[in-house]
């Protein structure tokens, strides 16, 4: 991403410019589903 203004013109600390792309066309899942079987991972079960 290239800023439109020169860095010397930003002032004291500068401005934070962020671009966010939001789409409602999402076919995937946010979290993968599956089973992990490992002795290295501790089992944490609370009542």
UniProtKB/Swiss-Prot annotation:
ATP binds at residue 47. GO terms for cellular component: cytoplasm. Keywords: ATP-binding, Chaperone, Cytoplasm, Nucleotide-binding, Stress response. Transmembrane segments: none annotated. Its main location: cytoplasm. The keyword Chaperone applies. It is found in: Cytoplasm. GO terms for molecular function: ATP binding; ATP hydrolysis activity; ATP-dependent protein folding chaperone; unfolded protein binding. It holds the Pfam family HSP90. Gene3D superfamilies: 3.30.230.80. The keyword Iron does not apply. Homodimer. Putative molecular chaperone that may promote the maturation, structural maintenance and proper regulation of specific target proteins. Belongs to the heat shock protein 90 family. This is Putative heat shock protein HSP90. It comes from Populus euphratica.
